[in-house]
Amino acid sequence: MAMAYSKISYEHREILLKNRPKDLYRISKKGTVPVLKLVDGTVIDESVDIMKWCIKQNDLDGWFEDNYTLQNRFIKNNDTEFKYWLDRYKYHIRYIENSYEKYQKEVEAFLIKYNLILQENYFLMGKKLSLVDVALMPFIRQAAHVDIGWFAQNFPALSEWLEKLKVSPLFLSIMKKYDIWDDSGEGIIVKWQ
């Protein structure tokens, strides 16, 4: 979403994680996605770092100008603590050391905080969309999809926020399906208007 927001054109290479091309490892030894390789050869292989780089290029609506420290704290908390519990909640069958209910309870603690904020605010930092909304949205969306009924019933403000983002022109513009890139050719050039 940050690339579309900042109108950053790029070469897109859609891959299957179960069949990662060798070229991915040549660009980043981590072999994870997303990865952004800049024209000067610089490689950015963390989602939030890619988002921040995009915003530094073109921050049309000031996504990262307000509550900078608080946004960074939310994002760090998401990427360390929330994601840990979210993975176990989503894949509870793999993580048998605790019950589904335990994982749901851990995820719930984060969702309660976000829901409380959104009962008072249109977005997580106030009246306008910011980087933290875009950074957390995919993870909250994943949490919601584990048990949509439970999520909607227990977190109405968060559900409304998520739905608002899911139907936004910005989100819809990035949801295009791409063919899987074969290791032998170029990717697809994506340009934002």
Segments (PLM) and residue ranges:
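GST-like domain detector, emphasizing the conserved glutathione-binding G-site
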Residues: 1-108, 115
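Short capping/connector residues at structural and topological boundaries
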Residues: 20, 49, 128-129, 156, ...
